Structures are given as structure tokens and as C-alpha cells.
Regions:
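Short, conserved active-site loop motifs that form the nucleotide-linked donor/cofactor pocket
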Residues: 17, 107, 139
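Conserved C-terminal alpha-helix-loop-beta "cap" of PLP-dependent enzymes
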Residues: 42-43, 47, 117-160, 168, ...
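PLP-dependent enzyme catalytic core of the Aspartate aminotransferase-like
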Residues: 13, 136, 151-195
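Short beta-strand segments
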Residues: 21, 35-37, 110-111, 117-121, ...
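Conserved PLP phosphate-binding loop immediately N-terminal to the Schiff-base lysine helix
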Residues: 1-4
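Conserved core segment of the aminotransferase class I/II
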Residues: 6-87, 190
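Conserved glycine-rich beta-strand-loop-beta hairpin in the small C-terminal domain of fold type I
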Residues: 80-94, 106-121
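Short, solvent-exposed loop/turn elements at beta->coil junctions and helix N-caps
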Residues: 21-24, 106-107, 145-150
Length: 195
């Protein structure tokens, strides 16, 4: 993966990109520490703006993070613990999707290499129906199109699956139900197209 700041600099556009990061999902939600990377000129501008926007950063929280993580190696080790907890959940969802939907050509997904979500693309015009059917059956999903600005997916096809919270047993049942909702919504769309 190319490092975008260096690539922009090489291309003569060093001020084009701002990169943001947060420990919010690493340490504890709502109290994470944010970080930003940008060109020297952009960082100078940001510092000038922050002088008048922020009276003082939460230094106690910053200290708490430094004491807990110590350095980048501490963060890496902590993230490995997260991976050990989350990996089986992601593997389970992907296995059920492969088993129930693989080869049917009514949806596609990518096995993520990190992160907290699986991006699922249904047939165009089906995402909202899938999410609604799942909710009616007792499985609450992230809103259809949540990955798009203002939640407006022009194809009504994208669903963000978040397997991090439910226990593994519940996750299997929920994913099977999700797959059933994908099948039902897809059949409804395809039959409607035949009219």
C-alpha cells in the first residue's frame, strides 16, 4: 500500500491530503486520542486554527493513554489482542456468507484485512429492503448506504456488516438470517424485473 502523503509530495501536491486517526475504538469509545498527519504547511494552518478553537486538550486522558500503551509497540500488541477477539467473528460471518450466498451472484463482499466492518454489496435496489426484512426478523443492521455521504447510496446496494458486538452463537444465526433476507429481496427484485 502506497503512503499517500509521500506520493502527493512526489507528485508536487504535498498539501492535498490530511490523514486522521483515533484510538477511540482501540482504547475506549468517546475518550480516544486523535492524531493527524499532513504536510508541514497544512499542519501549520491547523495549529493556528486550534489555538483559538481549543482552550486546552485533555492532558489527563493523554497521559492515561501514554501510560497504558507506552509506545507504538504497545499499541501494536493491544491491537493483536483485538484481532484475537474479532478474527473468529469475521471468519464466521464470511464462512456463512460463502456457504449461503457464494456463487449465487446476488451479492458480493470482500474479506477485510483489518477494520471493524464487512462491506456487502447486494443487487442494485435491494439494500434497504434487506435491512428492513432483517429488522422485521429481529436482526438490526447498520442502515443501508451508511458508507455513503448522508447515507444516500445511489445504487441502494451497500450494507455495512458489523460483526464485532454479538456473541459468536448469535452471530451465526444473525448472518444466516441476513443471507435469507438477501435471497428473498433478490428474488423479489428479479421477479419484478420479469414482469
Amino acid at each position: 500500500l502506497l503512503e499517500i502523503l509521500m506520493e502527493c509530495k512526489k507528485a508536487g501536491n504535498p498539501d492535498m491530503v490530511y490523514k486522521f486517526s483515533s484510538t477511540s475504538k482501540i482504547s475506549f469509545p468517546g475518550s480516544g486520542i486523535a492524531a493527524m498527519a499532513a504536510s508541514d504547511a497544512n499542519l501549520k494552518d491547523i495549529r493556528n486554527m486550534m489555538k483559538v478553537q481549543t482552550i486546552g486538550h485533555d492532558k489527563v486522558n493523554q497521559l492515561r493513554h501514554v501510560r497504558f500503551f507506552k509506545d507504538i509497540h504497545g499499541i501494536v500488541e493491544h491491537m493483536k489482542k483485538h484481532a484475537d477477539i474479532l478474527r473468529p467473528k469475521f471468519e464466521t460471518v464470511l464462512e456463512v456468507l460463502d456457504k449461503e450466498l457464494g456463487g449465487l451472484e446476488i451479492g458480493s463482499w470482500i474479506a477485510p484485512r483489518g477494520g471493524y466492518f464487512i462491506s456487502f454489496d447486494a443487487l442494485d435496489g435491494c439494500a434497504k429492503a434487506i435491512v428492513a426484512k432483517a429488522k422485521e426478523a429481529g436482526v438490526v443492521l447498520t442502515g443501508a448506504g451508511a458508507t455513503f455521504p448522508y447515507g444516500k447510496d445511489p445504487h441502494d446496494s451497500n450494507i455495512r456488516i458489523a460483526p464485532t458486538y454479538p456473541p459468536l452463537g448469535d452471530l451465526i444465526v444473525a448472518t444466516e438470517l441476513f443471507a435469507l433476507c438477501v435471497k428473498l429481496s433478490s428474488v423479489e427484485k428479479l421477479l419484478k424485473g420479469m414482469e
